Amino acid sequence: MDDARTLLDIKEYPDTEVQKNRVLTLEEWQDKWVSHKIGFHQEQGHKLLKKHLDAFLKGESGLRVFFPLCGKAVEMKWFADRGHSVVGVEISELGIREFFSEQNLSYSEEPITEVPGAKVFKSSAGNISLYCCSIFDLPRVNIGKFDRIWDRGALVAVNPSDRKRYAAVMLSLLRKGFQYLLAVLSYDPTKHAGPPFYVPDAEIKMLFDTKCKIHCLEKVDAFEERHKSWGIDYIFEKLYLLTEK
């Protein structure tokens, strides 16, 4: 990557047809967990969330925090340890079990009656509940509303053709006075088909502008050695804060 390249040099690409038609099945995502192809998992947690955590929480206690497509995100324990109630949804049962195991948390599991074949895993302390089902099955389960949403590796993982449906689910979960922190990736989508998918600014506005004020908090260089195999020479992560209009 050219070190002289600045953030302002990076062109915002319109979303491309090759990504719009790209589809990953739930089975393919589950296979990634089985074969441990989970380069998206961050063992130390997300640096930008860590940096903006206090501003995100605003000193409030007892918040309900939602993690869409949560995987085994270590940040779930961060929030639980601060006295908040965490709910996540993840298609991979393996990912959910690994979360509880790696965080040394005992848990119980029970079927979700509204969604055949789905389960919910609950920490023994009762402050973390992870639903093993499709995000699009969630409206059938009454999980209530949330004060905070941490969306990292979720919107960028949803098939582009499903984004409107996804945004509708997210907006339906927001409680009055919410804060929705959203991390997306910016790269040349003509060189990498995704996932993770490229989500341009215009798409975020189209999906959320009707109900949310949208503020870009930060844009950072996220390029790593592994990204070379994607055929790209730059990738930036952008952090947005969505609040009530």
Swiss-Prot record:
<keyword id="KW-0963">Cytoplasm</keyword>
<feature type="modified residue" description="N6-acetyllysine">
    <location>
        <position position="58"/>
    </location>
</feature>
<feature type="binding site">
    <location>
        <position position="152"/>
    </location>
    <ligand>
        <name>S-adenosyl-L-methionine</name>
    </ligand>
</feature>
<comment type="similarity">
    <text>Belongs to the class I-like SAM-binding methyltransferase superfamily. TPMT family.</text>
</comment>
<dbReference type="GO" id="GO:0005737">
    <property type="term" value="C:cytoplasm"/>
</dbReference>
<keyword id="KW-0489">Methyltransferase</keyword>
<feature type="binding site">
    <location>
        <begin position="29"/>
        <end position="40"/>
    </location>
    <ligand>
        <name>S-adenosyl-L-methionine</name>
    </ligand>
</feature>
<dbReference type="GO" id="GO:0008119">
    <property type="term" value="F:thiopurine S-methyltransferase activity"/>
</dbReference>
<dbReference type="InterPro" id="IPR008854">
    <property type="entry name" value="TPMT"/>
</dbReference>
<comment type="subunit">
    <text>Monomer.</text>
</comment>
<feature type="binding site">
    <location>
        <begin position="134"/>
        <end position="135"/>
    </location>
    <ligand>
        <name>S-adenosyl-L-methionine</name>
    </ligand>
</feature>
<feature type="binding site">
    <location>
        <position position="90"/>
    </location>
    <ligand>
        <name>S-adenosyl-L-methionine</name>
    </ligand>
</feature>
<dbReference type="InterPro" id="IPR025835">
    <property type="entry name" value="Thiopurine_S-MeTrfase"/>
</dbReference>
<keyword id="KW-0808">Transferase</keyword>
<dbReference type="GO" id="GO:0032259">
    <property type="term" value="P:methylation"/>
</dbReference>
<dbReference type="Pfam" id="PF05724">
    <property type="entry name" value="TPMT"/>
</dbReference>
<protein>
    <recommendedName>
        <fullName>Thiopurine S-methyltransferase</fullName>
        <ecNumber>2.1.1.67</ecNumber>
    </recommendedName>
</protein>
<feature type="binding site">
    <location>
        <position position="40"/>
    </location>
    <ligand>
        <name>substrate</name>
    </ligand>
</feature>
<keyword id="KW-0007">Acetylation</keyword>
<keyword id="KW-0949">S-adenosyl-L-methionine</keyword>
<dbReference type="InterPro" id="IPR029063">
    <property type="entry name" value="SAM-dependent_MTases_sf"/>
</dbReference>
<feature type="binding site">
    <location>
        <position position="69"/>
    </location>
    <ligand>
        <name>S-adenosyl-L-methionine</name>
    </ligand>
</feature>
